[in-house]
Amino acid sequence: MEKFTKLTGVAAPLPVVNIDTDMIIPKDYLKTIKRTGLGTGLFAEARYHQDGSINQDFVLNKPAYQNAKILVAGDNFGCGSSREHAPWALLDFGIRCVISTSFADIFYNNCFKNGILPIVVSQENLEKLMDDAQRGSNAVVTVDLETQEITGPDGGSISFEIDEFKRHCMLNGLDDIGLTMEKSSAIASFETANAASRPWA
């Protein structure tokens, strides 16, 4: 998993509450277990018309936001089913950080496991960031996980809280496998000692 220390990029505004995982990645895209290629299906029902043509009015289709790295979204983001394809689709599109006032628990934890930083802020701060994100290509925001600060286009900063263990994993690029490998020396030492003390096992 790629490390997350500091991210600077365009923030896209999505002021919609209760965006569920079905909206993030529709069921038609769930037939694969690959993590790549799902970016085309991200918000597909909003990004494309029924005939498959691009909906130019959807925020991520607008030229200023096509390479957005940060999503500023409404309350209760990621609710609904627990499909892990949702963070996969966000990541494959290029989104590495989602900022909202709240997240569904399963989606929130899945983000950390896949290298996406979900940040919870107050309603007041979300409104400030949403205003910043309306600036199009000038909506450049920096998210610093080391200092736990979000810096807007005008230089103003917002602090955010995050679980220390999750922060450690993101800063060091550790998913579940990486966490296990981090303890590989201790595991090897235990196995050696265990084999010596219990040769019959």
Swiss-Prot record:
Write down the EC number.
4.2.1.33
GO molecular function per UniProt? 3-isopropylmalate dehydratase activity
**Reactions accelerated catalytically:** (2R,3S)-3-isopropylmalate = (2S)-2-isopropylmalate
Its pathway?
Amino-acid biosynthesis; L-leucine biosynthesis; L-leucine from 3-methyl-2-oxobutanoate: step 2/4
Could you tell me the keywords of this UniProt record? Amino-acid biosynthesis, Branched-chain amino acid biosynthesis, Leucine biosynthesis, Lyase
Please give an example of a GO cellular component term from this record. Answer: 3-isopropylmalate dehydratase complex
InterPro entries assigned: 3-IsopropMal_deHydase_ssu, Aconitase/3IPM_dehydase_swvl, AconitaseA/IPMdHydase_ssu_swvl, IPMI_Swivel, LeuD
- List the GO biological process terms: L-leucine biosynthetic process
| Residues annotated as transmembrane | none
Enzyme class of the recorded protein, top EC level: lyase
Subunit composition?
Answer: Heterodimer of LeuC and LeuD.
What's its job? Catalyzes the isomerization between 2-isopropylmalate and 3-isopropylmalate, via the formation of 2-isopropylmaleate.
Q: What protein family does this chain belong to?
A: Belongs to the LeuD family. LeuD type 1 subfamily.
User: What is the protein's given name?
Assistant: 3-isopropylmalate dehydratase small subunit
The organism is Allorhizobium ampelinum (strain ATCC BAA-846 / DSM 112012 / S4) (Agrobacterium vitis (strain S4))
The gene name reads leuD
